[in-house]
Design a protein with these regions (language model features):
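Interfacial loop-to-helix junctions that mark the boundaries of transmembrane helices
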Residues: 1-9, 69-80, 149-159
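Membrane-interface "cap" regions at the ends of multi-pass membrane proteins
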Residues: 1-61, 172-175
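Short helix-boundary/re-entrant hairpin motifs in multi-pass inner-membrane proteins
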Residues: 112-132
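Transmembrane alpha-helical segments of multi-pass small-molecule transport proteins
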Residues: 10-12, 51, 83, 122-128, ...
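Short helix-coil transition sites and intra-membrane helix breaks within transmembrane domains
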Residues: 23-27, 54-59, 96-100, 134-141
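Membrane-interface helix-loop-helix modules in multi-pass membrane proteins
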Residues: 36-103
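Small-residue-rich segments of transmembrane alpha-helices in multi-pass membrane proteins
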Residues: 42-50, 113-119, 187-190
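Short amphipathic alpha-helical coupling elements at transmembrane boundaries
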Residues: 34-37, 107-114, 126, 151, ...
């Protein structure tokens, strides 16, 4: 169970995360591109750290540890296979996406594919990612956090969800993508 000094470190790290959100909000110029894309001026290494930090959420290490424990080291190939698509996205597609000036992948598909086929692809991506994939990922991360914080802090499911979602939504809504990237970097360093 977590003791006094642990609580102090947790409260300070949450306060720093919120502080980063407020600082990022002051840096944003108030337009859509500044909020959703951080003005398109973030350094490549910060974007990379954010991507890596995202895979270090409570769910991924827990899942991979379980895979190795139950099925052996060879099960790592399941997630190692994603390295190729990640590298392709980073070094080939990201440059083209940036050059096109779009904000979202659906907007990119709108430029690339027209007609009924393009509409079907955009609708599929919006429904699949918006209603299935993202909801599933958030549920898995939340379940991992509920289990971990239940043991470490004695929090029940609702307390964990309200605390985690509350802090995350606050710094995200206040500071936009700039805030998310900087908080990811801070939490990765922790």
């Amino acid at each position: 169970m977590i003791e006094g000094l642990d609580w102090i470190v947790i409260v300070i790290s949450l306060a720093i995360s919120l502080g980063i959100g407020w600082w990022a909000a002051r840096k944003n110029s108030g337009d859509t591109e500044s909020f959703f894309l951080a003005g398109r001026c973030m350094p490549w290494w910060l974007l990379g750290v954010s991507m890596v930090a995202t895979t270090f959420a409570a769910d991924t290490p827990t899942l991979i540890t379980d895979w190795v424990r139950t099925e052996g080291v060879s099960k790592n190939w399941l997630w190692w296979s994603l390295v190729f698509s990640g590298m392709l996205t980073t070094y080939v597609f990201a440059r083209r996406w940036r050059r096109s000036g779009v904000m979202t992948d659906v907007e990119f598909y709108e430029l690339r594919y027209s007609g009924l086929g393009g509409q079907i692809l955009r609708a599929y991506r919006a429904l699949y990612l918006g209603l299935f994939f993202n909801v599933f990922i958030i549920a898995v991360v939340s379940l991992a956090a509920i289990k971990i914080l239940g043991v470490l802090m004695g929090l029940d499911a609702w307390q964990t969800i309200l605390l985690g979602a509350g802090v995350t939504m606050l710094y995200s809504v206040v500071g936009g993508l700039r805030s998310v990237l900087l908080v990811d970097c801070f939490q990765f360093a922790l």
